[in-house]
Amino acid sequence: MRLIPAVDLKSGKAVRLYEGDPARETPYGDPVEAALRFQEEGATLLHLVDLDRALGTGENREAVRRVAASLSIPFQLAGGIRSLEALQEALSLGASRAVVGTVAVKDPGLLARMLEAVGPDRLAVALDARGLEVVVSGWQEAASASALDLLRAWAEMGVRTLLYTDVRRDGTLLGLDREVVARVRAAWPHELIVGGGIASPEDLHLLQALGVDGALIGKALYEGRIRLKEAVWRS
């Protein structure tokens, strides 16, 4: 199982949000320092999120460029990618893969065009949900779509990588909801990356046992609950 450190960008800084709430952020300083530390500890892929772009409050293009220039490992970029132009820009900034969420839920036609433009290896889809209740627009808006129906539709469209985040648990260090993760794993036939609430090595063991392909880890790394070098070795 691949361990993927997450670096969320807000106003050029690395932060973590509690349950996706922009008003409840914990700052963690220079994103380049965080990215380099994770790389040195053995990460083989980094997950970058432009929170300002996702929330419509700005963008962190320069911070992304700085992180990209500092890394020798690949990174994937998420946050506010809601047009073909934004997709191409994300890849031009150096991302090996772009991650889309709101578009995949609200505009399947655009998702199909994105897949056609760059292929399934360079485009992943994010299912952000409170349990299985889907949320969009930077996690600020509930969607009426059924999570399991979306998974079936995306698989049929040719999506090959899914990032599932349980927003209820993101940034909380509360651990995983085993039942929900198991349901997502059972419904998704391709590569599955899971985040939201991972707090301990035991959570990583649970994901491995459920057959999950990758773990998105944020606050647990910043707070020292999980030591990446040791976890990478054990995985």
Swiss-Prot record:
Per its record, the protein catalyses: 1-(5-phospho-beta-D-ribosyl)-5-[(5-phospho-beta-D-ribosylamino)methylideneamino]imidazole-4-carboxamide = 5-[(5-phospho-1-deoxy-D-ribulos-1-ylimino)methylamino]-1-(5-phospho-beta-D-ribosyl)imidazole-4-carboxamide
The pathway that the record names for this protein is: Amino-acid biosynthesis; L-histidine biosynthesis; L-histidine from 5-phospho-alpha-D-ribose 1-diphosphate: step 4/9
User: GO terms for CC?
Assistant: cytoplasm
**Active site annotation, chain numbering:** D8 (proton acceptor), D128 (proton donor)
Q: Which biological process annotations from GO are given for this protein?
A: L-histidine biosynthetic process; L-tryptophan biosynthetic process
Checking Pfam families in the record gives: His_biosynth (PF00977)
The GO terms this record gives for MF are:
1-(5-phosphoribosyl)-5-[(5-phosphoribosylamino)methylideneamino]imidazole-4-carboxamide isomerase activity
By sequence similarity, the record places it as follows:
Belongs to the HisA/HisF family.
Q: What is this protein called?
A: 1-(5-phosphoribosyl)-5-[(5-phosphoribosylamino)methylideneamino] imidazole-4-carboxamide isomerase
Write the lineage as a comma-separated list.
Answer: Bacteria, Thermotogati, Deinococcota, Deinococci, Thermales
